[in-house]
Amino acid sequence: MNGEDIFKSIVSGEDQSILGDVARAGLSLLSKGYKKAVTMRNAKFDANKGVVKVSVPVISVGNITAGGTGKTPMVRLICDILGQKGFHPTVLSRGYRAKDNSQNTIISKHGTILVEPEESGDEAWLLAKVLPKSSVIIGRNRIESARIAIEELGADYLVMDDGFQHRALHRDKDIVLIDASNPFGYEHVLPRGLLREPMEGLARADIIVLTKVDQVDPGLVAALRKRLARMAPQKPVYETIHKPRAVYTLEAWANGDEGHPIGTDVDLPIMAVSGIGNPKSFTKTLEGCGYDVVHTMGFGDHHDFSDDDVVEIWKQAFAHQAKAIMITEKDAVKLSQLHTFEDLKIPILVLSIGIEFISGKQEFIENLEI
């Protein structure tokens, strides 16, 4: 169990030990200070202080909890939609885990990738790879990134990745993603829970998208909708699933070659390996495709894989008699850079995942219009 798993076992209440109780009490005290600071910050932005509006439309994609909710595939979908309408969107990413995100760096220009993954961070580089007609810029200063996008790249639309709490840049549409399997981060703000801000902040959202609704009971989804109707009245709520798009060999994915249809390798017992916010969700997605998942190895979100990790992955695959290893696209960004991983004598497969609407996609597209 890694540090992230230990933390989640504490804040979720799964750890019922005395130490777990003590930890929760301490985290609750810290949460009070965090909540006060966030509330004061939000009050400033609610008064429109320190907010900069740029000359082109801005769409923000974010969430209210820490961890993965599906922002990357949603940003990809929005850029594809805008591209089909004839626009030239640029993605503004913070560049989490980039070598230096204090600088504003152009990662890709109209589909041409300009830097290596370690310079940009895994998520920004993945977006640059899968958006052949868009540009990607990283940097903590989103206002400066917006200026570069407009003046140097000719952007006529900006898509701010993970932007719900980055309020200094005015946005014309605020899209909030909520993971239906853990919608409100154990009902507490950080660090006692996973909420980045109090749930009342959802009232700022223009559009709410529930993700992974296929991984929870329909009754829970209905209850979640009722709760959202109270917290964010009159705001449209859409239900989506994480829909696998294709499977690639690691070499084919790295080279930009074609993948093959989902289900081609379902006869192979596979081991799921991921360094994402919700490894169990990845396993459920694979099982939903018919794959025989014999073992799951979950690392921390944005994990920096090492040669030692590769050795352990191989040992676990051998111990569980896996005939292939399945990884996410985000992890493929880093693992494709490790020669030891490429040398494993077992097929390495990459699952590409997109967002699919249960219903209301056309209405969602219309609501994007500014």
Give the predicted meaning of each segment.
Residues 1-14, 183-321:
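C-terminal accessory "lid"/substrate-recognition subdomains
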Residues 2-57:
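A transmembrane-helix-recognition feature enriched in membrane-embedded lipid enzymes
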Residues 42-111, 215:
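Walker A (P-loop) phosphate-binding motif
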Residues 61, 137, 178, 240, ...:
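Hydrophobic residues at beta-strand termini and immediately following loops
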Residues 87, 96-235, 239:
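Phosphate/Mg2+-binding loops and adjacent switch elements
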Residues 88-92, 176, 269-273:
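Conserved beta-strand elements of the Class I
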Residues 243-245, 300-304, 344-370:
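Short, flexible loop segments at boundaries between secondary-structure elements
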Residues 323-330:
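Acidic beta-strand-to-loop metal/phosphate-binding motif
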